[in-house]
A protein has these predicted regions:
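Amphipathic alpha-helical interface elements that mediate macromolecular binding in regulatory proteins
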Residues: 24, 28-31, 35, 39-47, ...
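Intracellular leaflet-associated regions of eukaryotic membrane-associated proteins
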Residues: 1-24, 121-125, 137-152, 168, ...
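Residues that form ligand- and interface-recognition hot spots within folded domains
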Residues: 30, 81-84, 96, 109, ...
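Generic beta-sheet signal
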Residues: 37, 88-94, 152-161
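A cross-family acyltransferase "interaction/gating" segment
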Residues: 126, 153-156, 163-240
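N-terminal membrane-anchoring alpha-helices
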Residues: 1-76
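Catalytic core of membrane glycerolipid acyltransferases/transacylases, capturing the structured
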Residues: 43-140
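Eukaryotic intrinsically disordered and solvent-exposed regulatory patches
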Residues: 35, 76-80, 85, 98-102, ...
Length: 250
């Protein structure tokens, strides 16, 4: 999660999924029959992963089982410095690379990500988002999240202040300030995602399309890096707090 030194917007997003290199394109074509078989097989396995995650209560055991099952889907999760994860922090701040970042981090620790876009209901719930019933302004959302965080028994919040998935290579979108208005201590989490043959994510692609491509490729590796918690300074504005956390990410 590197601080963005104002890179051009076009550098932050990938518009083409397929490789332009001739050798990689040939390799992708040769792999395609295998990828299609994996896609079909993983769709069936994915249903079982979903059912298991629904049936089992949130616990270390469930996260372990689902993480192992996700490896069959080609999703591998690595984390560095797990001891830095602060059990007292109620807000995690992460960069945004794919449509499934919140699901991946949830394999490592219990957390909730509020639904910011899209219609509420089964799809929202099945994707692992938390519905707050707030459809108004960001101020109303912040008030709801403050109320949520005031109950210490609730899992921490996982928020993505970029509010859009980037390629994770060229820098970060400028952080929105509202996630830093909830509490005075946050913990940054850096995400890196790698996969062979095709790009990790494409701008404006739907989550269903991204899921199908994820099942098609041989594997996708998520690297999660925990960083020390960052407290707000005295009388520090949320905008300045957001900028400082973004810089700490580097």
């Amino acid at each position: 999660m590197e601080p963005g030194a104002a890179p051009g917007p076009e550098r932050l997003f990938d518009s083409h999924r397929l490789p332009t290199d001739g050798f990689l394109l040939l390799a992708l074509l040769l792999y395609a029959p295998v990828g299609l078989c994996l896609l079909v097989l993983r769709l069936f396995i994915g249903v079982h992963v979903f059912l298991v995650s629904c049936i089992l209560p949130d616990s270390v055991v469930r996260r372990f089982i689902v993480r192992v099952m996700c490896s069959v889907l080609g999703l591998f999760v690595q984390q560095s410095d797990p001891r830095l994860r602060d059990v007292n922090v109620q807000v995690y701040i992460a960069n945004h690379v794919t449509q499934f970042d919140h699901n991946i981090i949830n394999l490592l620790t219990s957390c909730n990500t509020p639904a910011l876009n899209g219609a509420p209901g089964f799809i929202c719930w099945s994707r692992g988002f938390m519905e707050l019933g707030v459809t108004g302004s960001r101020a109303e959302l912040v008030d709801s999240l403050k109320a949520y965080s005031s109950h210490r028994e609730n899992p921490p919040l996982l928020l993505f202040p970029e509010e859009a998935a980037t390629n994770g290579r060229a820098g970060l979108l400028r952080f929105s300030s509202w996630p830093f208005s909830i509490l005075d201590v946050v913990q940054p989490v850096a995400l890196q995602v790698q996969r062979p043959l095709i790009t990790v994510s494409v701008a404006d692609s739907s989550w269903i399309t991204e899921l199908l491509w994820t099942f098609f490729v041989p594997f996708t590796v998520y690297q999660v890096r925990w960083m020390p918690s960052v407290p707000r300074r005295a009388e520090e504005l949320s905008e300045d707090f957001a900028l400082r956390v973004q810089e700490v990410g580097g």
